[in-house]
Amino acid sequence: MSQSREGFESDQATLKVYDTKTSTVFSVTQGHDTSLEEIAWSSDEKGLFFTTHRPGFLVLGYISLKGKDLEYLVEDRSVIGLTVGPNNDVFFEASRIDSLPEIYRYEKTSRELSQISHVNKKQQEKWVFGQLEKIKIGEGDRQTHGFVVLPPGYNPYRQYSLLVLLHGGPRSAWTNQWHHRWNPQVFAAQGYVVALPNPKGSIGYGQEFSDAVRLNWGKASMGGTLAFTKHLQRRSDIRDDKTCAAGASFGGYLAHFINTRSQLFQCFISHAGIFNLDLFWSTTDRQWFPEWEFGGVPWLNKEVYEDLSPSSAIEGFRAPTLLLHGQKDFRVDVSQSIAAFTTLRRRGIPSRLVYFPDEGHWITRPQNLGLWYEEVHTWLAKYLR
């Protein structure tokens, strides 16, 4: 895998092959506007299987060494963990927002997909899942694609509170995939309509769309997020006076950024969210990351850092905010949430800080994850019910 822009972790990843006989390197995916994630040689060594982000899914694909068109094999669920067996059979884990993870086999010769594990069968049959809707608003450069998860037992004649989840990254995306963190079904089960927008900066929509957030954090992603939210608030089944936004890492940063500039939301949740970009540069374990995103070091790009930092717009803070953070977070230091909490409290805005002394950037311990969800549910219930 090869990237052309030094210091940019989310640059387009091109697949290249080194020919040991001719000592030459050739590109297999040149000309395709996509980045490959996992790759695995086919059993006949004539091509490679891969996963890549497409709108709303992490799909399974195949490309021959001749460099022809990418062939997408499984596009109706999200795929991870490729293993190739004999006869070009591919084994992997696949899931959807309403379908728990299982192991599948894709037979390339017959083009048949079969489920070979049933470890989550009892849970799948027992649990009631909310219905999933695909949403796309706008066109071209202004489009925002995403999902909506309805509460179980949804009644179109009722009105529901709205929870907008903000993904991290910023170069990431909400996909139709099951995950234990920020699981939309868990929130939908509380009686909320859950929105999963993929605004500018999201992956799976072309490199230009992903690149749009550089030197424009917050502003680029906020536009699509607000448009997506307003689109849903105009629906008859949504209460426009009961809306909360929540996210982690960049999503937590975006929550702070929107809170200083919009009155669309009644509450926010920020997990490991960036509050002060100068402080972020000086405390993160990856200084090259903000230097790429904001065009260099803070003292030489003061205007960019200040313009995009939520801490520069403290007067705009208005909505109650729940903050959560782990002490062992080396990506976004815990001082970010402490600073945001202190500022919110000093401004007289209802806020709460939940501190995990034994967690890092993500909450990974089951007991802590249970507490995390409990705190989040309690906060949402206070402002959305």
Which residue ranges define each predicted feature?
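A flexible loop/linker signature enriched in serine peptidases of the S9 family
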Residues: M1-K16, S27-L36, T51-G61, E75-R77, ...
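Cap/lid segment of the alpha/beta-hydrolase catalytic domain
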Residues: E6, R111, V119-D241, A248-S249, ...
